Amino acid sequence: MSLTYMNMFMAFTISLLGLLLYRSHMMSSLLCLEGMMLSLFVMMTMIILNTHLTLASMIPIILLVFAACEAALGLSLLVMVSTTYGMDYVQNLNLLQC
């Protein structure tokens, strides 16, 4: 396993650990999710380029589309919660029920 793959795997695990440990604020959770998606994108792109899989070259772009949709939904939820309650705690999401 090369050093670049190990760095991307470490970035993914650190983002996952940050998501598990700092889950009280929504902004930190969203940043950790974006770090996980970015490291997955880079790892998938490197694997596809190194193995010369031309048929799977569309998969990282599809992952980026899902990451952009996740970021847009997360930011809209963050804006809605912060304008309604004045803080971005994840525990306030239980109060959004109809």
From Swiss-Prot:
<dbReference type="InterPro" id="IPR001133">
    <property type="entry name" value="NADH_UbQ_OxRdtase_chain4L/K"/>
</dbReference>
<keyword id="KW-0249">Electron transport</keyword>
<keyword id="KW-0813">Transport</keyword>
<comment type="similarity">
    <text>Belongs to the complex I subunit 4L family.</text>
</comment>
<dbReference type="GO" id="GO:0045271">
    <property type="term" value="C:respiratory chain complex I"/>
</dbReference>
<keyword id="KW-1278">Translocase</keyword>
<dbReference type="InterPro" id="IPR039428">
    <property type="entry name" value="NUOK/Mnh_C1-like"/>
</dbReference>
<dbReference type="Pfam" id="PF00420">
    <property type="entry name" value="Oxidored_q2"/>
</dbReference>
<keyword id="KW-0679">Respiratory chain</keyword>
<feature type="transmembrane region" description="Helical">
    <location>
        <begin position="1"/>
        <end position="21"/>
    </location>
</feature>
<comment type="function">
    <text>Core subunit of the mitochondrial membrane respiratory chain NADH dehydrogenase (Complex I) which catalyzes electron transfer from NADH through the respiratory chain, using ubiquinone as an electron acceptor. Part of the enzyme membrane arm which is embedded in the lipid bilayer and involved in proton translocation.</text>
</comment>
<keyword id="KW-1133">Transmembrane helix</keyword>
<keyword id="KW-0830">Ubiquinone</keyword>
<keyword id="KW-0520">NAD</keyword>
<feature type="transmembrane region" description="Helical">
    <location>
        <begin position="29"/>
        <end position="49"/>
    </location>
</feature>
<dbReference type="GO" id="GO:0042773">
    <property type="term" value="P:ATP synthesis coupled electron transport"/>
</dbReference>
<keyword id="KW-0496">Mitochondrion</keyword>
<protein>
    <recommendedName>
        <fullName>NADH-ubiquinone oxidoreductase chain 4L</fullName>
        <ecNumber>7.1.1.2</ecNumber>
    </recommendedName>
</protein>
<comment type="subunit">
    <text>Core subunit of respiratory chain NADH dehydrogenase (Complex I) which is composed of 45 different subunits.</text>
</comment>
<dbReference type="GO" id="GO:0005743">
    <property type="term" value="C:mitochondrial inner membrane"/>
</dbReference>
<keyword id="KW-0472">Membrane</keyword>
<keyword id="KW-0999">Mitochondrion inner membrane</keyword>
<keyword id="KW-0812">Transmembrane</keyword>
<feature type="transmembrane region" description="Helical">
    <location>
        <begin position="61"/>
        <end position="81"/>
    </location>
</feature>
<dbReference type="GO" id="GO:0008137">
    <property type="term" value="F:NADH dehydrogenase (ubiquinone) activity"/>
</dbReference>
